[in-house]
Amino acid sequence: MAGTNALLMLENFIDGKFLPCSSYIDSYDPSTGEVYCRVPNSGKDEIEAAVKAAREAFPSWSSRSPQERSRVLNQVADLLEQSLEEFAQAESKDQGKTLALARTMDIPRSVQNFRFFASSSLHHTSECTQMDHLGCMHYTVRAPVGVAGLISPWNLPLYLLTWKIAPAMAAGNTVIAKPSELTSVTAWMLCKLLDKAGVPPGVVNIVFGTGPRVGEALVSHPEVPLISFTGSQPTAERITQLSAPHCKKLSLELGGKNPAIIFEDANLDECIPATVRSSFANQGEICLCTSRIFVQKSIYSEFLKRFVEATRKWKVGIPSDPLVSIGALISKAHLEKVRSYVKRALAEGAQIWCGEGVDKLSLPARNQAGYFMLPTVITDIKDESCCMTEEIFGPVTCVVPFDSEEEVIERANNVKYGLAATVWSSNVGRVHRVAKKLQSGLVWTNCWLIRELNLPFGGMKSSGIGREGAKDSYDFFTEIKTITVKH
């Protein structure tokens, strides 16, 4: 919709129509600290309308063949790809990430999400067994669950929203999605493409607002039997409490405190640039980012020197600048939270090698109030420190030495999270051995963030419940039924 007083005004998308809201909240451009957008402050009334629309659309959408639904998803992908630059510009402005990253990762992956699930939904099979001595045959069928409640985070806004919408739609469900109120623009833009792609009214409803108001209304609604959430552990605990009385299906993808383990036989020419990227990509605002780096003592000094030098080459600045590697953090509150971890580390006697409080950040006048922070490397810190145990979710990483394989495995596992890890070594036997012992849902060896969407994604321990991916997402968004026929 058109802006008012130069502000972009978003509207909810319910039953195929854009609808205004009675109240709005401000959304800020992270690179300037200025309000540039107003987001609906939705609540129970908007959720009731969305549930009604989704329930009414469900019988028709769920009865379509997988091939018909696949065609619609592919059409959404085509339209999104045609608008890639427009979406990338919007994502960068709304989230603070570099335009280069939005162009090369966020929006292309969003396109791929629709195409991937459009294809994978055509290749599922069912089980069948026979009990000849009883004259019985057993087989399974899967059916869509119904109305899917989807809650996505602010760090990869469209990327993770489509990672939920696409499999839910492909399986035959209808959707009520709630993006983060901090990054709602590309979700709103996506709504404009749905009708063009042939998505029937009510199949996808997107309701904007805060977690305590609209999020809780969605999660607690008795006619929304399934919730898929990506975000923080405290919010997941609240979702679990609200869902328990209704026995809802839950998929919870939460935080991480991801270790990188670098053995003395690692190829540092490959390891160092990859570990800088895994530590600071997207301002460190990726649940898979590395925030604990364990380096074998014999190469610790060399690694640290080269790692700090490489980190300092990552330029922080205006997200649209093609030479910039790190944009702005999501909000002023989050920036202060990340900075507070560095202050606490200093109070504990840690050393800061580069970044916050050490190097000077130079920004244009217009961006002085933006939420920028230099990539920061911390050493001389204990494993029990908050910087080594809590998810910081910013451009901060800790580098510590280790002696033996057994020691580093124990230390790497000594946190409540278990999402991802990386292992660097030229010893093939070692990387297999260590990967199996790490309490992580994903382990990369001699690489980072290479994803195969057919395989499970998700974490152990406090990093979540369930897995996402081709088969796992299909299983989550469907209910299985066993049928026995006596002949």
Curated annotation (Swiss-Prot):
Active site: E253, C287
Alphabetical keyword list: Cytoplasm, NAD, Oxidoreductase, Phosphoprotein
Pathway it works in: Amino-acid degradation; L-kynurenine degradation
Gene Ontology CC annotation, any one: cytosol
Positions carrying Phosphoserine: S362
EC category: oxidoreductase
Catalytic activity field: 2-aminomuconate 6-semialdehyde + NAD(+) + H2O = (2Z,4E)-2-aminomuconate + NADH + 2 H(+)
Tissue: Highly expressed in adult kidney and liver. Detected at lower levels in fetal liver and kidney.
Protein name (Swiss-Prot/TrEMBL): 2-aminomuconic semialdehyde dehydrogenase
Organism whose genome encodes this protein: Homo sapiens
